[in-house]
Swiss-Prot record:
Taxonomic classification: Bacteria, Bacillati, Cyanobacteriota, Cyanophyceae, Nostocales
Keywords annotated in UniProt: Membrane, NAD, NADP, Plastoquinone, Quinone, Thylakoid, Translocase, Transport
Subunit structure: NDH-1 can be composed of about 15 different subunits; different subcomplexes with different compositions have been identified which probably have different functions.
Molecular function terms, GO-annotated: oxidoreductase activity, acting on NAD(P)H, quinone or similar compound as acceptor; quinone binding
Family: Belongs to the complex I NdhN subunit family.
Keyword hit for Transit peptide: no
Major subcellular site: membrane
Designated name of the protein: NAD(P)H-quinone oxidoreductase subunit N
Cellular component terms per the entry's GO annotation: plasma membrane-derived thylakoid membrane
Length: 162
C-alpha cells in the first residue's frame, strides 16, 4: 500500500457495488483513514460492531426491542425478570432523516463482520438496493494490506453453491 492513498478506488467501488467487504491489517488504523476519506467525499459514516447485533434486518430497518444489561439485578415487577424492553427506532431510517442536506448518503461501516452469517451478509448486500442513499462496508477479515471486493463475492463457498 502506498504511503499516501486517496481512497478513490474504494469510494468508486462502493458507489458501483453499493456494498463492499474489506480485509484490514490486524494492527488497525487503516479503517480510520478510509472513513475520513469517505467523509471528505461527502458521505456520513456510522461505525458499529457486528457482535451482539442480533437480527440485522430488524436492527437496521425496523423498530426493535432491546433490554439493557441487568447486571445481576432482577426487577420486582410482574414482567420478565431481566428487565423491561425498550423499543428503538430503525437505525438506518433515523440516520437518513438527520443527514446534512449536501450529503451523498450514509455509509454503514460494520467492524468484526467475519462473525455474520451468509444470510445476514446477503441482507447487507441487498440493503443499498432497498435504500439507494445507504452504502455498506463490512470488515470480513484480516490481511497484510487493506483490500476490498464486492460484498457479494465474500460469501462462503458452500453458500454460493446453494
Amino acid at each position: 500500500m502506498a504511503l499516501i492513498t486517496t481512497g478513490n478506488g474504494l469510494i468508486r467501488d462502493l458507489e458501483k457495488f453499493g456494498s463492499v467487504g474489506v480485509y484490514v491489517p490486524l494492527e488497525g488504523g487503516f479503517e480510520g483513514r478510509y472513513r475520513r476519506r469517505l467523509r471528505a467525499a461527502g458521505y456520513t459514516t456510522l461505525q458499529f460492531t457486528a457482535r451482539g447485533l442480533g437480527d440485522v434486518a430488524a436492527y437496521l430497518t425496523g423498530v426493535h426491542g432491546v433490554r439493557p444489561p441487568h447486571l445481576g439485578k432482577k426487577s420486582s415487577g410482574n414482567g420478565a425478570a431481566v428487565g423491561n424492553v425498550y423499543y428503538l427506532p430503525p437505525i438506518v431510517g433515523s440516520q437518513l432523516e438527520h443527514l446534512p442536506p449536501k450529503s451523498k448518503g450514509l455509509v454503514l461501516w460494520i467492524i468484526e463482520g467475519h462473525i455474520l452469517s451468509d444470510q445476514e451478509v446477503e441482507f447487507l448486500t441487498d440493503l443499498p438496493k432497498l435504500e439507494p442513499r445507504v452504502k455498506v462496508v463490512v470488515e470480513r477479515g484480516g490481511d497484510r494490506t487493506f483490500r476490498w471486493k464486492a460484498l457479494k463475492d465474500t460469501f462462503s463457498a458452500s453458500y454460493q453453491a446453494v
